[in-house]
Design a protein with these regions (language model features):
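Primarily recognizes the serine-hydrolase "nucleophile elbow" in alpha/beta-hydrolase
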Residues: 113, 122-177
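The feature captures the conserved acid-bearing segment of alpha/beta-hydrolase catalytic domains
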Residues: 163-213
Length: 246
């Protein structure tokens, strides 16, 4: 009888070698998951979902007032509706100059950390005021595998230009000479659903009304640029997007 290496014996040999090469597989254990990227050096606030049935993770980049009334209230409203939120404090993060590419990589870290940790599939990107100016730059620079998971971008009170460092003069409405135009970055987000919220008294200043008709879903709300407690229409617009059955 020919005792050569038959296909059946070859298959058995390869399987045996694979089991010895991987003790976890030999023991019937699944392979260990890759470690989550660290986010300890970022000024983040965790607001876990308080209801089940939704698969979105929202990242909220705050205004230059930091984690304040509007950011807290909007995040809590979304969490009650089942959307987990990671708040990102712009005031602390942009105290030193950043650049769009580096900030986009930090957003990538946040998503690669919290998507698997909280078992979420889709991404909602929210920016308020200063954060709304910056968020399109970050969204347009995400790697393809994360970009395709972005189901909604919500911009609350965006202006024409963005700066990547906080200047106290901006509280007086004075743009920095280093600011960058926001419109070209929004144009890079073709195909993404965008919600743009603005105060009814800031119609002549908001970027929302300068965007091409039909490009975004407009959400007018009472008042001026400062949202305060008037975040209800914004929360409803976000919660009404992509609702999944529980």
């Amino acid at each position: 009888m020919n005792a050569g290496l038959t296909p059946r014996r070859l298959s058995t040999l390869l399987l045996t070698l694979a089991l010895f090469a991987s003790p976890a597989l030999a023991a019937g254990e699944p392979p260990a998951a890759a470690p989550l990227p660290k986010v300890d050096n970022l000024p983040l606030i965790k607001v876990p979902a308080k209801a089940s049935g939704r698969d979105e993770l929202a990242v909220l980049l705050t205004g230059d007032g930091g984690w304040a009334q509007t950011d807290k209230g909007l995040s809590e409203a979304l969490a009650k509706g089942g959307i987990a939120v990671v708040g990102w404090n712009s005031l602390r993060y942009f105290l030193k100059r950043r650049d769009p590419d580096r900030s986009a990589r930090d957003l990538e870290r946040i998503l690669r950390h919290y998507l698997p940790l909280w078992h979420k599939e889709k991404v909602i990107l929210i920016g308020y005021s200063f954060g709304a100016d910056v968020m399109p730059f970050l969204a347009s620079r995400l790697p393809p595998d994360l970009a395709e998971r972005v189901s909604l971008i919500a911009l609350v009170g965006p202006s024409d230009s963005a700066d990547f460092r906080f200047h106290p003069s901006e509280w007086l409405g004075k743009p920095s000479p280093e600011s960058r135009p926001v419109m070209p970055e929004i144009e890079k987000l073709a195909g993404k659903e965008i919600v743009c919220a603005y105060g009814e008294t800031e119609k002549g200043k908001t970027l929302c009304l300068k965007l091409p008709p039909g490009r975004v879903r407009l959400v007018p709300r009472p008042g001026n640029h400062i949202v305060g407690k008037n975040y209800g229409p914004i929360a409803q617009a976000i919660l009404g997007h992509g609702r999944t059955a529980s």
